[in-house]
Structures are given as structure tokens and as C-alpha cells.
Amino acid sequence: MAFPADLVGGLPTAAYQVEGGWDADGRGPCVWDTFTHQGGERVFKNQTGDVACGSYTLWEEDLKCIKQLGLTHYRFSISWSRLLPDGTTGFINQKGVDYYNKIIDDLLTNGVTPVVTLYHFDLPQALEDQGGWLSEAIIEVFDKYAQFCFSTFGNRVRQWITINEPNVLCAMGYDLGFFAPGVSQIGTGGYQAAHNMIKAHARAWHSYDSLFREKQKGMVSLSLFCIWPQPENPNSVLDQKAAERAINFQFDFFAKPIFIDGDYPELVKSQIASMSEKQGYPSSRLSKFTEEEKKMIKGTADFFAVQYYTTRFIRHKENKEAELGILQDAEIELFSDPSWKGVGWVRVVPWGIRKLLNYIKDTYNNPVIYITENGFPQDDPPSIDDTQRWECFRQTFEELFKAIHVDKVNLQLYCAWSLLDNFEWNDGYSKRFGLFHVDFEDPAKPRVPYTSAKEYAKIIRNNGLERPQ
């Protein structure tokens, strides 16, 4: 099964999840430092990213892994507070600049394309102290940070992601409070953070477009997470509509303003307005974009970056009591099929990725698509011979093959999560997504390839999948 040239060849990491060195060389604290140091069992065994994979001092080891696999692309994120300790350009930490310069230069020397994420969940604590994503002031601060990165690294970086999974961060960090910064403003916080993130992304895109694109000739987008929503009963109109609301609230909430017309989906606006009225709010809990803002937001992405891990069945669940919450606004319930295998929240549903790719193609005018994350975890302790996990990848590649060759989806890059076992947010080190095993007990943090790494390298080398014997 042959793939288009260089389709499979990427692996990502994220700064807080791998770097460690949380207070090394002038790095300022980020919200995940604060969140994990506060304890309270919000993270598995109160684990932290203080050391993680040690990539801040062990970059050379990561580079060996990248070369061993023959990667074409390496996606990494910049620790905002390592570059700018208080989040602003008032003070620049040169040692942080040097670290990322070395990564970029080493990748290019070895023929690997850097894909750089500006912000992957790790907001500088100094900015959170001023309101974080709930404050409109963050929009200009993010734009200045983005411009600093474009001017510092953009002569060598052609592919940028502004914000990683804003939809996850808004719900988990500012609505439910399960993620850092742990703000629990149910029914309001997530929407407010999202409103500011969309505008911040758009501002950064325009800055690139007007100040850097002509010379640097790069591309800018953002990465959106999506759980594919499958109607529980495909013959039930109620469930079909519930699945439509599910993808509208989760995915189109960000994608439609940015890729289509600068505004939220009509279904989302009407659902939240109707619930807000029932709850006695004087106006909708979802802010409105001005006409000027809609023009500013529309069309601010140069490719479509999506992250898929799993699927859920969706059923209609009427919000009779007018309860607050995103799922309650959407009037949906999510659940898994008991027959789906998997670890933790990742149920293995390879066909979901093909459905999602087709949805993007049909809804967003057949864009160039990058899958910037997709993966399967093992429980700790993991098996180095992870043949069963590789089978999940193999089935996924078969679905990608069909999406490309049968459905004519314009997929141009696939990145498996992740290069290394790492700090998996609330799961700490208990879930292992890496293609390389990391021994977190050993101070040297040795990296050892799983069977999956060797198989992934074969796909890169052969530009396709060998059929199972």
C-alpha cells in the first residue's frame, strides 16, 4: 500500500511533556508547574514535568532517535516561559533562544523539517496571574510572542502551529478545571477562553502574513483535536442531530470561524442562547464577534491540522433541568462500545479517522490536511515488543490509504504521537504513547525503541505499508 511521498514521517513532542529543566537557565514557571506542584491528586500520583524526559539537557539523545527512524518532520513546541520568563518580550532569556536554535539547526542539518508549535498548554504563570485566556489582554501578548518567534526562528521554520488543541484546553483548563490552570467556570470559562484564543490565533496569523510571509514563505495554522462523534442509532433523527451538535461544539466551534466565515456555527449559537435564557442570563453566555472581528478571523489558516485518537457514540440527552456545562448546552451524551479495545480514554476505532478526514474534506472545501497527532498508549509497565499496539497503527494506516486513494482526501502529513514516552498531563507517566521507551527511574533517561518504532521506520523508508503475511 503506497502512500504519497513523505506522507508518513513525522513525530511530535511538547515542551512541558518532555523537556524537564523546569527552573533551569532562567526559565519562568508555567501554569503546569504551578498546577502539578500544588498536588491534590489532580495528576496521577502527584507526578510533575519537572524532569520529564530530560530533553532540555538530552536533546542529542532525542536527535539520535529522530535519525534512527529517518523522520522527515519533527514537530516540537516552544516553552513560552523558557523564551520569555514572564510571557512578555520585556525580558528575553537568551539561553532559551539558544536551545531552540540548536534544535532547529540540528534538524535541518539532518534533513528533517521542523514543525513548530508556539503554545502547547503551558501558559507562563505570570500571564495566568493577570487573567490568562479569560482576559482580552492576552490577545496582544500572544501576538507579540508569536512575532518574536517568527522573527527569531522563522528564517529556518516554514511550518507553524499557533495553538495546540485550543478546544481541549478551553474545556479542560477553564471550564471543568481538570487541566492547568485549574479554573472551573462551568458553562462560561471555556467559551470566554475560546473567544480570546480564536482572536489571538487570527492576530498572529495576520502578523505572519503581513510582516514575515513574503520573506520567509512559511505556513501558519492551529491544531484541532477531534473525537469522531458517531450517532448511537444511525436511524434515529435525534441521535443524528446529537452527533451533528457534538462535532459543532467540539470541532467546528474553532474551525468554522477560522476556515469559513469568521463566526461560530449557528447550531452552537442557538443552543447556548436558548440554554442561557432558560437559566435566567440576560444574554447568551457565548460572546459575539463584531463584524470587524469576523473579517479579521476568516481565512486565517494555511492548512488544516487535526489530531485524532478515538471515537465515541453519541446520543441525544435533553437538558431538562437547564444545567450549566458544555455537554449540557449541546444536549449530548458520549459513550464507548464495550467491544472497542484500548487503554484509558483511547478506545481503538481506526474507521473514525477516515470519517473525520472526509468530514473535513466535505465541510472545509477539501483543504490540505496534516494529522499532527494520532496514537495509542500502553499502560505502565509497557511491553518493548508492542506488536499489539503496532496493529492499531497498521489498521489506522489502512484507513488513511482508503481516505487518500478512494475518498481523494488531500492528506499531506501524518505524525504519530509521540517520539518519546512522556508526561501525559493528568495521567502523569502512567500512559506511554512513545515510539521510544523512556526509563523514568534512571537519571540518564535512556531511550529504547519499541517494536512500533522499527515498524514506523520501515513505513518511512518504503513510503507505504507492507501487507501482513
From Swiss-Prot:
Activity regulation: Inhibited by 2,4-dinitrophenyl-2-fluoro-2-deoxy-beta-D-glucopyranoside.
SUPFAM superfamilies the record matches: (Trans)glycosidases (SSF51445)
Expression sites (tissue/organ): Present in hepatocytes (at protein level).
Subcellular location: Cytoplasm, Cytosol
Lineage of origin: Eukaryota, Metazoa, Chordata, Craniata, Vertebrata
Name by which UniProt lists this protein: Cytosolic beta-glucosidase
Enzyme class: hydrolase
Keywords attached to this entry: Cytoplasm, Glycosidase, Hydrolase, Lipid metabolism
